[in-house]
């Protein structure tokens, strides 16, 4: 029998739907089993959140912040357990998941600052009375979390939503339910009132029931572009509901004149292969100049890529890359590599899959001669190389995508960067830094098929509350001068 994995109105209960499980993707051992939440249980979660809303929203910001800070204390106290749980379900090495657990704590202070600076009260004097701007919570919001950062990314929606006074229904990825369960238990220990956060676990049917529920006032999503587009279509014609989408990318990294080729190779690897290529900001396309300088960089990159250590999350000698999220995801990367070869690509470093596991080795594939390159996000460690003669040509080809999440330039030329910054279409643009690097205090998100709004702890404040403009006077009073045509005795 599976265990209670649904958290509704402050109570843990067993799902009434189909059974699902999560595995350690390194070996396919089952580490979590539960039954999905049904549409009726999703409805109960929405009702609980609605019932809890006014009491939570009526608390002062200081009172809400006190509970959120208690959650931060729980995160610190249980950081190693959280890091291990994330590693078990995602396959990422512990050095990475420990960083993720720490980032969850960091978002608390950033979210506090954001609320005060972006959604606080503003008063302006008027000849009679005052003009006020205040912010109010939307109400009941659904948060959909991804599998690649199952703690950190949902946290970037949930914390600012709660601080603003919303109540939440959290639907995590079905691939990382154990992380979600642990996170909710830490919220429970922090003293969060019943109904303020509700957890509904399950697969597609559970997610559809939540996304389609008429009782939610908004939906905050981090995940694939495909699912995000489905949600956007589903929400069409509902302008009264706030929809925040952070989706994928087909991200370019361009190299021009650089002196330190060793540093360039390092930043390319960090951009393309960290988290086994399962960051939405990972470099998918590498643009190298033709000629000897580009040749040297490519040769060094090939050598360094072949030397990347891939291994288990808990190896004493920590690997750079762990497992991908599943054997199916890993097999999908082999399929993508083969499809590119059929289009005319040349494999420079073969991506290889250890069958029945999520392990793959990183791959590099030369794609310059593919005339009609597919605009697909291959979510894994497969880097496509394009050679160029002209910088503007490279930028044009980098922009030839429906996505627009992250982009980067490695160059010793400030003029090149200024030109690149003006021309490139992306929400995150880095210079001489890996393009996977981002700050929770900065806007995180893109344009086009990469989404709307900015899902980070700081800028999330913008979509977690709406502004209310008021003109106010403490007592009803006649104006000093009446409008023309008025006479009031």
From Swiss-Prot:
Gene Ontology BP annotations? arginine catabolic process to glutamate; arginine catabolic process to succinate
Give the E.C. number(s).
1.2.1.71
Signal sequence range:
none
Q: Which GO terms describe its molecular function?
A: succinylglutamate-semialdehyde dehydrogenase activity
Residues noted as binding NAD(+) in the record, renumbered to the chain: 223-228
The record's keywords, sorted A to Z, are: Arginine metabolism, NAD, Oxidoreductase
Q: Note the superkingdom of the native organism.
A: Bacteria
Catalytic reaction(s) noted: N-succinyl-L-glutamate 5-semialdehyde + NAD(+) + H2O = N-succinyl-L-glutamate + NADH + 2 H(+)
Pathway(s) it belongs to:
Amino-acid degradation; L-arginine degradation via AST pathway; L-glutamate and succinate from L-arginine: step 4/5
Does the record's keyword annotation contain Aminoacyl-tRNA synthetase?
no
- What PROSITE patterns does the database record attribute to this sequence? ALDEHYDE_DEHYDR_CYS, ALDEHYDE_DEHYDR_GLU
Q: Which residues form the active site?
A: 246, 280
Summary of the function given for this chain in its UniProt record:
Catalyzes the NAD-dependent reduction of succinylglutamate semialdehyde into succinylglutamate.
Q: Which family does it belong to?
A: Belongs to the aldehyde dehydrogenase family. AstD subfamily.
List the protein's name.
N-succinylglutamate 5-semialdehyde dehydrogenase 1
